[in-house]
UniProtKB/Swiss-Prot annotation:
Gene Ontology biological process: translation
Alphabetized Gene3D superfamilies for the sequence: 3.40.1370.10
Gene expressing this chain: rplD
Disulfide bond entries: none
HAMAP family for the chain: Ribosomal_uL4_B
Family listed: Belongs to the universal ribosomal protein uL4 family.
PANTHER family on file: 50S RIBOSOMAL PROTEIN L4 (PTHR10746), LARGE RIBOSOMAL SUBUNIT PROTEIN UL4M (PTHR10746:SF6)
InterPro entries linked to this entry: Ribosomal_uL4 (IPR002136), Ribosomal_uL4-like (IPR013005), Ribosomal_uL4_dom_sf (IPR023574)
UniProt keyword list: Ribonucleoprotein, Ribosomal protein, RNA-binding, rRNA-binding
UniProt xrefs under SUPFAM superfamilies: Ribosomal protein L4 (SSF52166)
Organism, as annotated: Petrotoga mobilis (strain DSM 10674 / SJ95)
Protein's UniProt name: Large ribosomal subunit protein uL4
Amino acid sequence: MSQIDIYNIQNEKVGTLDIKDEIFNIDPNMDVLYRYVDMQLTNKRAGTASTKTRSEVSGGGRKPWPQKHTGRARAGSIRSPLFRHGGVTFGPKPREFHKDLNKKMKRLALKSALSVRYRENNLIVLDEVKFEKPRTKDVKNILSKFGMEDTKVLFLFPYHQEQYENFKLSARNLPKVKVIIADNPGQNKKNVDGLNVFDLINSEKIVLTKEMVNKIEEVIG
């Protein structure tokens, strides 16, 4: 077991928390991290790019000029790829972009990403976050207290509760702040839906609550 300090939103230390080494302090597997991010970015591709071949563009039914005696290069159709408005050779067509990883590799990637941030001292645990109403100024005050005004920050919360929803609304105007509520209320079992490797490693600091730490340990431990 390792320990991590717990802070309040005023950046005052209020205690420590035991965290599992097998989740937050493993030797990161960079290959699996790469595979996970590659999978995420690949699966975001729409695959809708499409061009027309010479058989699909309009026109080109007859030979534009005689084969001989014009002094011009021979041509059989004005929709040849050599012509303006002609068909495209080897252009993109709609296709399915999809990659997947097995559950074991996905969990290893999440653990690796969390461990990277923990070892960099870029993992911050808050005792609680209470937002009675959305207010961007309050989020900016928290960032200021921790010296993160110009830092890419990821906030992780465990449940779709009013206080966390209000925080998410408060932060939506801040371009360097992302908030993930890692929960799917439609599932009966506990889950960390929304928690992903790309956002973990794309942020410079990760801020989460004690509840979120416990939930991560319970679900992916």
